C-alpha cells in the first residue's frame, strides 16, 4: 500500500484527506463530480463541499439508466467514486471568497461492487493494466485543435469565425491571442504544463499544446481541456467547438496523438542503432495500429462529420501507412531531440472522440502488434496524396473507411478492438453510431437544397 493510500483515522486515504484540507483552505463551496458517457460527453453532479468526505468514503449514487449507453431502468443504481488525484479548482468559477472544484470519478456497479464495464475511464484502465502486465508504462500527448466562432446577440453559436488568420499568424490577423492566453492561464491553474499555443491553418482555428503524461492522466486532461476551452471562450462571447470539420474546403481539426512505451524507466521505442531510431517494439506497435486502423477509426473518428476531415488535400491522413517524415501518412515518427523523446504520432484521431476509448483502442491495437510480433512495412517518404490507385496497390497501401458506416462495419469485424472496448461498450457504441449514420443518410442537407431545388 502506497503512502497516499494509507487510511487516516477518519477512514480517508492520505490523498483524499489532502483534498479535504485543500477544500477548506481555498474556500471551496461546491464540488463537481465528473465522468463521461460512452460517446465522450462530460457529465457531472454537483455536491456541497460539506459532502466531500462522504463522497470519498461512500461514493455518490446516481441513476445510470438516464445516461445514454449505461444501463437499463431495472438496474439503474450506479455509484461515483472520486479520484482524489484529479482535484482542481475551476478557474472560471473562482470568486473572491469562494470557489468551485472538480473531481473526476470512476463508475461502479452497485449490484456487484465492481467497476462498471461501461465506464470509459475503466476501459482505458484495463488497457493500461494489459500494458503493465507486459512490462510497459504508456505515455501519451494529444494535440486537440479547435475553432472559435462568433456568438449572435442571443448567445447562440454562429458559423462566423472570430478572425481571418492563418498558420502562426500574429495580430491583427490573429484576433484570439488574448483568448488563448486566458485559456492557458486557466489550464495552468488546473495543473497543465503548457508548451505552446498558436493560430492554426484555417480561419478561426487554434491549437494549445500541453506536455505528455501517463495515458490515464492524458485522457483526463483532454476531457478537462475541452471544458476549459469552451468555458473561457464563452467569457469572451465566443463559441469554441471541437467539431472536426465545421467549415468545408479548409483544414479540419485533428487530435494528433503521440504515444511511447517505457520499460524499466527506459524508452522502449528507442534504438539508436536503427535507421529511424525506432526499436523493434516500436515497429511492432506501429504495425498493430496500422492493421487495426479501420476499426480504431470508428472510435478515434466517431462522428459523421469526422469523415469530412479525412479527405486528401487538407493535411489529414487517408491512407494506412507510416513515415519517418511524411505528414500524409497515418502514423509519423517525429524527430526526437533525446532518446527519451522517441515516439510515434497517430495522425488520424480527431477531438470529437471519447479520449478514454480512443486511447484504449490505440493501446490495444499496438500491444496486439507486439504480442504477435507483426512485421512493420517500410516507411513511405513520398506524398501519398499524389499516388494513383495503381501506385498505392504497388506499395500495399489501404485506405481508411470512407464514412462512419464503413468504420463501424470494420469495428464489428475486429475482435481485438471489440475486446479492447469490452462487450457492453462495443454493443452500445455500435448501436448509437448505427443510429447516427442512419439519421445522416435520410437527412436533407443545405447543399442538396442549393443544388437541386430549382434544378428539377
Swiss-Prot record:
Protein source organism: Haloferax mediterranei (strain ATCC 33500 / DSM 1411 / JCM 8866 / NBRC 14739 / NCIMB 2177 / R-4)
Gene that this polypeptide is encoded by: glnA3
Residue span(s) of domain GS beta-grasp: 26-113
Localisation: Cytoplasm
Cofactor notes: Binds 2 Mg(2+) ions per subunit.
Record field: catalytic activity: L-glutamate + NH4(+) + ATP = L-glutamine + ADP + phosphate + H(+)
GO molecular function, one term: glutamine synthetase activity
Protein name: Glutamine synthetase 3
Positions contributing to Mg(2+) 2 binding: 145, 200, 207
Cellular component terms (Gene Ontology): cytoplasm; membrane
Record keywords, A-Z: ATP-binding, Cytoplasm, Ligase, Magnesium, Metal-binding, Nucleotide-binding
Subunit structure, as described in the record: Homododecamer. Interacts with the nitrogen regulatory proteins GlnK1 and GlnK2 in the presence of 2-oxoglutarate.
Positions contributing to L-glutamate binding: 251-252, 309, 315, 327, 347
Cofactor(s) the record lists: Mg(2+)
Family, per entry: Belongs to the glutamine synthetase family.
Enzyme class: ligase
Chain coiled-coil ranges: none
